[in-house]
Swiss-Prot record:
Pfam families: BACK (PF07707), BTB (PF00651), Kelch_1 (PF01344). Its main location: host cell. The keyword Repeat applies. It comes from the Viruses. Residues 123-219 form the BACK domain. Kelch repeats lie at residues 252-297, 298-346, 347-395, 397-441, 442-492, 494-539. The BTB domain is responsible for the interaction with CUL3 while the Kelch repeat domains supposely serve to recruit the cellular substrates. This is Kelch repeat and BTB domain-containing protein 1. One of its GO terms (cellular component) is host cell cytoplasm. Transmembrane segments: none annotated. InterPro entries: BACK (IPR011705), BTB/POZ_dom (IPR000210), Kelch-typ_b-propeller (IPR015915), Kelch_1 (IPR006652), SKP1/BTB/POZ_sf (IPR011333), Vaccinia_A55R (IPR024182). It comes from Camelpox virus (strain CMS). Interacts (via BTB domain) with host CUL3.
Amino acid sequence: MNNSSELIAVINGFRNSGRFCDIDIVINDERINAHRLILSGASEYFSILFSSDFIDSNKYEVNLSHLDYQSVNDLIDYIYGIPLSLTNDIVKYILSTADFLQIGSAITECENYILKNLCSRNCIDFYIYADKYNNKKIETASFNTILLNILRLINDENFKYLTEESMIKFLSDDMLNIKNEDFAPLILIKWLESTQQPCTVELLRCLRISLLSPQVIKSLYSHRLVGSIYECITFLNNISFLDESFPRYHSIELISIGISNSHDKISINCYNRKKNTWDIISSRRYRCSFAVAVLDNIIYMMGGYDQSPYRSSKVIAYNTCTNSWIYDIPELKYPRSNCGGVADDEYIYCIGGIRDQDSSLISSIDRWKPSKPYWQTYAKIREPKCDMGVAMLNGLIYVIGGVVKGDTCTDTLESLSQDGWMMHQRLPIKMSNMSTIVHAGKIYISGGYNNSSVVNGISNLVLSYNPIYDEWTKLSSLNIPRINPALWSVHNKLYVGGGISDDIQTNTSETYDKEKDCWTLDNGHMLPRNYIMYKCEPIKHKYPLEKTQYTNDFLKYLESFIGS
């Protein structure tokens, strides 16, 4: 006798011939003979049953008629060394039986089989099963598979068997794999139609209402399973009072723009969620000290230096939808560098900077509307400056800090509207070269230079400005002081990355924890190179449907974009 497998084979031979068998498992009219000792060694259920007062020690049979005979028989064979023969059709029955009999190794083997074979064709079936039998491992895996394949599953025959509670979980999840929020109501409507169940307010609350197009909102109003429910109509009538929603994880692409070594190319990088790395998707010959603005998913780069010693008036752009460069854009009114860039729904703005002729500071704000042949002067800053923070919030252009005459930083904060300039609460410290972002109705700035006289102190400060109360709040400082970093917001979280620290460009990133008010180094968003950063922008996926007129079959039209 060399090993345990040979021993179990001999014992199985005894079972087949009836030798030493001391128990019969009875299931309806079927009997399975076995040995108490062997069953007790493999099954916690049998171990407790045979070593307690559950049955008379002299009794030679156990009735398990509430279980599936074939599954019990397969598991008894498994205990006696015969491998399980698993398929998608039978694995659920064997797993639930193994779970009842508490045969740990069989449970693990069945779970591993399901996890290995889990796909869009069976994930709903396994999710319903796991939910019923409280198997968290399979439930989590199948839940994530449904999230990933949700648009493929809305026409699956099992889609209608998902419960309202399950649909609330799916529709609420940030990881729901849709590239545009308009697809979430489509998922909801397809489920309502398959179940013929009227909509509820709880289901509508799962949608990111503020991100929906007017056409889809109209589709919700007009659908019989939504529009006929008074509570649902009341909810939709009050959507203007709902808080702003954050896009789902898959509905945006995170794009960064930067340069690494001197005279290196401009790099356009896209964040790869699966690998937690940045992929360089395009590059273009060297340019530095330019302004960046994003409009309609096109990244515009204005002015700066190229490989010549002179400032440039050229404007180039990168289309994130077509992954192509655009060069036929009207030039700025004159060459400039170290300027600021923002955009509203119509215009791109180039603000301040340094002029090429005599390196004088610029006060003009020029703007350009795509399709127009030239740039126009829109306004002038009160004090000429460069390297300031700029932001567009609530239709106002904010200009923050910057470098003014005498190479000193300033602490001014002013906003421009159609009525002119307005001064606001000054910065707590004079700053320039910081990164700026609008997040959750506030302006955030981080890093840069700070000094009351000569520009020379690298900052790790992070500040937020509340326009309602006209006040600045100091947040926890960055771990690494840096100038010209990128500050960005994704899924209600703040990140900062790149820039220059101690005269060396860095590729490190940090994440802000709002509850703990602290920044932590974030290896997941570490940049591919040491970058001076010009922008890190979440790009929302757009579809042609956004400019389509509403029709009664708009949701069917929307469905035609699945897979595109």
